[in-house]
Amino acid sequence: MNYIELKHYLKNAEAIDDFLINNGVKKLDIDNSKNSFINYYEEYLNYYDFKIVKKDLVKVDTSYIKTPARTNNQNHSWYELLYRCIHGDSYKSKANISDHRLLKLLTNLTKMSLEDLKNLYQDGKSNLSLYDFNVFYRDGQPPIYIGINDGTHRIIMAKILGIDYVYTDNVQVYEYNKFKHDVFKEMKKAIKVFKDFLNQSEVFKLSADSTHIKVDVNINSYTCIDQFFYDVSPLDFNKNVESYREYIYFLHFYLKVFKEVEDAYKNSFNVYKHLPLRLLEFMLDSSSNFHLQNIYKHKSEFLRHVFY
C-alpha cells in the first residue's frame, strides 16, 4: 500500500487509532502521543550556556525529546501532526510538516511488523535511528532534547509508535545558568510592569511599533527619541547579560519618573488637564520629538508648572 492509498484508506475505511492498534501499537502509546505537546523551549537559549558538541553515539530516551527539527509546530500534539495529514488542518493553526513524507513512514506498518520497525529505530545505525539534537541540562531535572537539522517526520512517527529510544552522534550541549535566568525573569517582569502602566496612563502611551513612548496631551503627540522596548535576541542576551541588568535599572528608574509626572497630572486642577504647549518646553526637543533625559532633568520644573 502506497501513501496515497493509505491516506484514502484511513480517511474512509479505518480510523487511525484502529489502524495503529491493529498493527501492534499500544493504546497507551497512542494516548501519550495525543497528550504530549510540542514545546521548543525557545527561552532556554537566553539563559542556558553552550558547552560542547558531542559526536559520540548516545542513546536518547524518546520521552526526553520535546520537539522535531522543524519549527512552527508549537503546541500541537505529536498525534495531531499525523491526524492533519489525513483529515486536513483547517481545524487548527497550520503546521510545518510534509503530509506525504509522514504518511510514507506510516506505510512501513503495512510492510513489516512493529517489532521489526522498532528494531530499525533503535539499532543506532539506520537512518530511522540517528538524529541531531540540542540538549539542555539542569541539575535535578530530566534533560530536554530539541530536534535540529533534519529527521522531523521520523521522530514524529517514533513518538506515535511508542519507540522507546533513538540515537544521536551529533548533540550540542547546553547547561543552565541561574544568574542569567534570574536576570531574564527580572527583565520580563520590568517590561510587563512598565507596559501595564502605559496601558492605563493618561499622559504616556506606547508607540504603534511598541518600541517608543509618546506623550499625548490635548491634541498633540510627542515621541520619545530614546527606544524603550526591544526584540531581545537570545544570543545577544546570553552574551551581554550585564547590559540587560543596566536596561532593567533604566526601566525601573524611568517608570518612577513617569509615575511622578502622571500622579501630578492627575492630581492637578482641572484647568491643567489640558496642558498648554509652553509647559512642554521643559521636555520637548523639536516639534515632534523629545529626549528622555529632558523629562528627568526638568521634572521638578515641569511638575511645578502643572500645579501652578
Question: Where is each model-derived feature located?
Answer:
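A short, basic-hydrophobic beta/loop patch
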Residues: 126-186
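Surface-exposed, charge/polar-rich loops and edge strands
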Residues: 2, 22, 26-47, 51-67, ...
